[in-house]
Amino acid sequence: LADAATSYTDVMSEYDGGSRTFFHFRGANARLSAEHILQMESPARIFHLGYLLLLDELDKPDPQHGVVAARVLKELQAKGYETSVDVVSEEGGRFRSIVEPCLPHIDYFIVNEIEAGAVCGTQLRSPEGVLLRDRVEAAAEMLMHRGIGRLCAIHFPEGGYALTREGDTCWCDAIPVAAKAIVSSVGAGDAFCAGMLYAQHERMPLRDALRLANASARFNLF
């Protein structure tokens, strides 16, 4: 789009606590439409869409499918693509209203524990911040019941958990990293997602897929 600037994000990280603030400029991404995507022809096996809730045209309501993104994903699956979706963490009711209609048309749903909890309407950590493994498992099952086609993977600083359509499950602990060695955690979730998608593309066993995803996230920290 010649008349639109490229989208970008500035991330401000605290030196001590590691808290992050994101300043995002949508730019041309706000005008990415169903037509732009559906005219695409590619020999690739997996179509990855990111990020829902930041793509104005695709986040719009659709009378038949809930949101435009759901229609796009359904049509891509009909063309033979396996679909993957990433979302941006956002508070409020808009999150579920946009993400839920897409679930039946997503093959691989790879999200963090905050995003998984937001879709399911529950907290996956205790008030003290402890990861609740039973809730993680229940959230993955709930997401699969809502239509995810092949795999739901939930990642968190402690590691990752995955559930397949066939009912296979796996927990995998994160690879230990000394806090002082971490340069930034920005992009670690994306690195996990990339590792998991590569593993799915190569049809790797579930445990190996989680190990690769965790390793990819680990090396993103330096």
Predicted feature locations:
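Conserved post-catalytic alpha-helical subdomain immediately downstream of the catalytic base
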Residues: 146-151, 175-222
